[in-house]
Each structure stands twice: as C-alpha cells, then as structure tokens.
Amino acid sequence: MPDNRRSQAITKGAKRAPNRAMLRAVGFGDGDFDKPIVGIANGFSTITPCNMGLDTLAKCAEHALKNAGAMPQMFGTITVSDGISMGTEGMKYSLVSREVIADSIETCVQAESMDGVIAIGGCDKNMPGALIALARLNVPSIFVYGGTIKPGHYQGRDLTIVSAFEAVGQHSAHKIDDQELLEVERHACPGAGSCGGMYTANTMSSAIEAMGMSLPHSSTMAAEDEEKRISATRSAEVLVEAIKKQILPRSLITRKSLENAVTVVMAVGGSTNAVLHLLAIAHAAEVDFHIDDFEAIRARVPVLCDLKPSGRYVATDLHRAGGIPQVMKMLLVHGLLHGDCLTISGQTIAEVLKDIPEQPRADQNVIRTWDNPVYEQGHLAILKGNLSPEGAVAKISGVKNPNITGPARVFESEETCMTAILDRKIKPGDVVVIRYEGPRGGPGMREMLSPTSALIGEGLGDSVGLITDGRFSGGTYGMVVGHVAPEAYAGGVIALVEEGDSITIDAHRRLLQLNVSETELERRRAAWQPPAPRYTRGVLAKYAKLVSTASRGAVTD
C-alpha cells in the first residue's frame, strides 16, 4: 500500500480538486500529493521554559521530513505551566490540559487525514497528552521531548525549581532572609527546558523512551544542547521509515511495554504522576493494565538512580552517566525488562540495547551498581485500606518514618492548608488531610507541591504525614499519599474524616487507614451530603462531569 494511504482521502481524484487547491496555498506542488502528509504537533509556547525551545525542534523536524520525502504540516497544541500555576486556582486546569492536548492532536490528525505524527512537548502534561492521542489515532507516530533544563547554581549548590518552593518554607520558618530567598528565585531556572530533577516531565519522557515511542537517549538530553536538535532531525527520519513499514503505536504500547515503562520509572525514582498517566495511556491503547500492576512491579525493581527530588543529581547528570539506555540495559540483564518489545525504529528493545555496557561507568555516582542500589525496592507504592479501597499512591523510599499514626488535621482545600502551615499551626506527628481536590471535586486534581515543600522548608517533612485526593508534583517527597480513591466528592471515606481522628500511614504494610469504627463511619456516611459543584460552566464543569476516578487514570472517555 502507498505511504500516503490516509491522506489520499483528501488528495486523490478529480473531486478533490478543491482540497488540493487549499493545500497548494500552503506550499504543496504538483509532485507532492503522492507523498505522506505528516503532522507536527508543536507545543511551542513562551508561557514556560519547558516549551520555549520547541519551535526550534519543530523546524528541525520539518526540514528533515521534507528531505525524507514527506510533506510536513505544523499545528499547535496548548500547554499549561504547572510551576507557574502551582498553588493557585489555575492549577485546576493542569490535568485538564492533558485531555485538551490529547483531544486537539486527535482532532487535527483525523480531520486532515494525516499519514503520521510527530508530537513535540515539554511541560508535564504534554507527554501523556500526546501519547494518549497517538494511542487513540494508531497512525505511525513518534514523540520528541523538548529536553530538560540545566541546573541553576547558587553558593556552590545545584538548584531546581523545587529549591524555590522549599525556600518559601525556609523563609517562613526564618531559616533564610529575604535576600537569600530572592537569590534562590533568581538562580533556580537558568534557561530553557523542563524542570531538571526526576520530576514529572523527565519521568514521563523516560517512560516514553522505555516504551519505544521516542529515540534512545532522547529523554535526558538538555534542551539547549545541539544533540537535542540532532535528535529531532533523526526522529523525523525514523518516522518516515515507520510510515513505510506501518509501525503503529498500538504495536509499541502493549502490556509488556507498559510493564517496561513502569519498571524504568521505579528504577529512576520517578514521579507519582506516572501512575495516573500510564493508566490513561493504557486506557487509550485499550491495554488491560491496572493500578495493582504498579505494586507488583514495585516489589521486584530496585531504585538504581540517585536523582532529585529525594536524591542528589538531576537529569543532565543521568544523561552524562549513560541515560535511560544504561538503566534499561541493567534491568534487561537482570530479567526485569521485556527485551522483545518493538520500538519505533523497528528494532526490539534488546537490539537497541545490544551495545550498551552491562554495568554503569565507575567514574559516576548517578546510576548505582546492581549490588548497591539506592533502595532495594521501588518507591511508588499503592496503599489500600478503608481510606483508599481503590488505592492511593505514595512515595515510600527514603522516608525516615515509614509508619505514622497521628491526629488528622483536615482542610477542604490546598489554600487553607497552606495558610495553616505558614502560620506554624501544623505540629510534628500530625497527619494533614487535604480533600475535595480530586478529579471531580477540585475539579482537576491539583498538585500539592506548595504545602509539601513548605512542610519540608519548615523542617516537618519527616514528622508530618499528608494525604489528599489531589496529586503531587514530581518534585514532592516525604511521607505523602495522593490519588486517594474514591475521592471526597464521590463520597469516599476521606470525606468522612473529622479533625483529630487517628490516621495510620504504614508504608511497609502499604496501608492507609482511618482508625474509626465502622459503626461511626456509617453514622457519618448517612449524614454526609455531596457539596455543590464549584463550577457550573466552562471547561472545568465539563471535565468534572466526564472524568473517571484516579484509580483508572482520571480519563474522560
């Protein structure tokens, strides 16, 4: 079959003369209508450093597509800057943007009968939004990551955006003065690229590389380095070959490749958001994959990389140490990866990794040897109990107090909790509960980076637990539990918690328990009434009506 089998619907035959006339206006010539039309879903934006370099990559891809015999068509997708909207009402739109990105890419590609897609993204929701769309479309596709930001520097230490969030808590606790807070602010983000630790953007780019939907080594490159532009060019060339071979996303996004992605996320110490996003990608690809699969994988995979937020290094350090291919080779050698999974290049994972050393280089400390892992088991645990019968997600590795039982401090929103923290009203041993921040209740499932960072900045990160039906940033660490499901708005037990109730977070037993009798819970449940929707018009109102529970990925279809 021809490489332009889809676009023939708009380019072939006498009755398509009007269609061709429009295409001629955007640069098509007589010899171009037999070429495959490839969409470039360009997330370029000056809203955020994560995306401000994407236009350069899109132009590299556009040029390479033309040289390889394809006809590129550029179109835009939105982005939301989580770092800028964090801690505000605007953060409610962050997870919503994942769906908008997915829907917009699907809409454009289907409407214009494109033969292939290059999706280019940077900020957190760009990656899962794009992969959801590519899985739905199932036309030859590749993802190009915009790249990671380089670390900032101040007083001899590396900084990331999380340094600035934690500095707010340090400032509130009078550990640093106004000038030092300002200097951290000035130096935390030195240029283009996504947030530099193993936060959500770098986690998801690593997962996409592990699934074979992007090129090897591409997920840890610095945004401003020349190799990132070379990678964008090479991605376009590989995609044209994939169109010829009809390598489709659903032949790459399989149960085995999702297991590979989760395995890599565990090994690099990735973000809790990976659980939500990989469930959503699996749903889009119609793959049978569930929240309990994460726990099964966690139990057998060590954390091999010493990366921020809880570790010492950033993504550019990981890149210099060998990147995701080095991590994957170690996992493959020890039987924890499926080497027979196909990649966009047409090679299997095992073939891609054939020339990668089995052991990390001795002159680096980012990737540990197999017999000296950072932690012996994965860090993203699925906690269950009467507070989260559908599951909740916690980062448990490195927590100094893996078992906390304490009085509940209940807040109906992130803002009220943040005020209490900065007013020094949270004490060691407390278990903070932030509810009505779930997918429907928020709506939008905001990330709680501001309160968790403030707790750490005030020295309470090891002594205070925090649970929420909202999410956490990839920059969060400490005894925190998110994605509590069912959420409060849906009548989950988290809605029934009262101030002072005893709550247990037990990482070892993977337990999240409200220590209140079932009789008392039944009394409270009978008296509970769902709150009125916070929004009755617009995108948040639509989202709240459509979105599923977090334990299914907060999907909308």
Swiss-Prot record:
The active site is at S473 (proton acceptor). The keyword Translocase does not apply. [2Fe-2S] cluster binds at C50, C123, C195. Mg(2+) binds at D82, D124, K125, E447. Keywords: 2Fe-2S, Amino-acid biosynthesis, Branched-chain amino acid biosynthesis, Iron, Iron-sulfur, Lyase, Magnesium, Metal-binding. It catalyses: (2R)-2,3-dihydroxy-3-methylbutanoate = 3-methyl-2-oxobutanoate + H2O; (2R,3R)-2,3-dihydroxy-3-methylpentanoate = (S)-3-methyl-2-oxopentanoate + H2O. Its cofactor is [2Fe-2S] cluster; Mg(2+). One of its GO terms (molecular function) is magnesium ion binding. Pfam families: ILV_EDD_C, ILVD_EDD_N. Pathway: Amino-acid biosynthesis; L-isoleucine biosynthesis; L-isoleucine from 2-oxobutanoate: step 3/4; Amino-acid biosynthesis; L-valine biosynthesis; L-valine from pyruvate: step 3/4. Coiled coil: none annotated. The modification N6-carboxylysine is found at K125. Gene3D superfamilies: IlvD/EDD C-terminal domain-like. It comes from the Bacteria. Its EC number is 4.2.1.9. Binds 1 [2Fe-2S] cluster per subunit. This cluster acts as a Lewis acid cofactor. One of its GO terms (biological process) is isoleucine biosynthetic process. Belongs to the IlvD/Edd family. Functions in the biosynthesis of branched-chain amino acids. Catalyzes the dehydration of (2R,3R)-2,3-dihydroxy-3-methylpentanoate (2,3-dihydroxy-3-methylvalerate) into 2-oxo-3-methylpentanoate (2-oxo-3-methylvalerate) and of (2R)-2,3-dihydroxy-3-methylbutanoate (2,3-dihydroxyisovalerate) into 2-oxo-3-methylbutanoate (2-oxoisovalerate), the penultimate precursor to L-isoleucine and L-valine, respectively. Homodimer. This is Dihydroxy-acid dehydratase.
